[in-house]
């Protein structure tokens, strides 16, 4: 009975070790799952490339996050122009100054 418990415990330790090695090899860790704070680099060009990965609920095109407006001139959703938005931040960007 005692040896079977030892065998089960040893098997669990080996499985956890193998799983940890696999996750660390493919780059999955708690640090990679944290969404970066992009507010300081949030502009029309998104200077921080890490922020571009987190266009939550937004479209991504040509290096920027885009937000579709609700309705523009009764156009279907596919034909509507997209408005650039900050990644990680729900505020609308102001137009670039000339």
From Swiss-Prot:
Keywords, ordered alphabetically: Antimicrobial, Disulfide bond, Fungicide, Plant defense, Secreted, Signal
Top-rank taxon: Eukaryota
Subcellular location: Secreted
Signal peptide coordinates: 1-19
Gene Ontology terms: cellular component: extracellular region
Disulfide bonds: 38-88, 42-65, 51-86, 55-87
Annotated coiled-coil segments of the chain: none
GO terms (BP aspect): defense response to fungus; killing of cells of another organism
InterPro entries listed in its UniProt record: Defensin-like_dom
Pfam families on file: Defensin
Family stated for the protein in its record: Belongs to the DEFL family.
Official protein name in the record: Defensin-like protein 68
Source species: Arabidopsis thaliana (Mouse-ear cress)
Lineage: Eukaryota, Viridiplantae, Streptophyta, Embryophyta, Tracheophyta
């Amino acid at each position: 009975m005692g040896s079977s418990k030892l065998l089960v415990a040893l098997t669990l330790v080996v499985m956890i070790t193998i799983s940890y090695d696999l996750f660390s090899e493919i780059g999955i860790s708690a640090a990679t799952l944290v969404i970066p704070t992009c507010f300081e680099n949030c502009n029309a060009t998104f200077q921080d490339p890490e922020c571009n990965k987190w266009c939550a609920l937004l479209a991504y095109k040509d290096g920027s996050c885009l937000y579709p407006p609700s309705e523009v001139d009764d156009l279907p959703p596919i034909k509507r122009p997209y408005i650039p938005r900050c990644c990680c931040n729900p505020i609308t960007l102001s137009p670039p100054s000339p």
